[in-house]
Amino acid sequence: MPKYKVIAHRRVHKFISDLKDENLKSTVKDALSKLENYPLALKEMDIEKIKGLEKTFRIRIGKYRIIFYVDGTEKIIYVTHAETRKKIYKK
């Protein structure tokens, strides 16, 4: 099965670097690396499609959410946002 390339926006990299909890930081990094195995990652992690947005999904890690878009033709996953649940759905 071909792997997907995961590209994260710089605000996602900033979010990860600003996390104080090292366990949470490694959990987020692991989740992003597991996305390379999309669509198998859908079964391994808490991933759901975002209603109203085509090919856009969210990963839930505790109170945090990671939003990503899947380009199936190019085999690329664009990670666009990462933030607390309270802040992420206001965007």
Q: Which residues fall in each region the model found?
A:
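Enriched for short, Lys/Arg-rich terminal
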Residues: 2-5, 10, 16-17, 22, ...
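Generic low-complexity, intrinsically disordered sequence content enriched
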Residues: 23, 28, 36-39
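A short, surface-exposed loop/turn module that caps and links secondary-structure elements
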Residues: 33-58
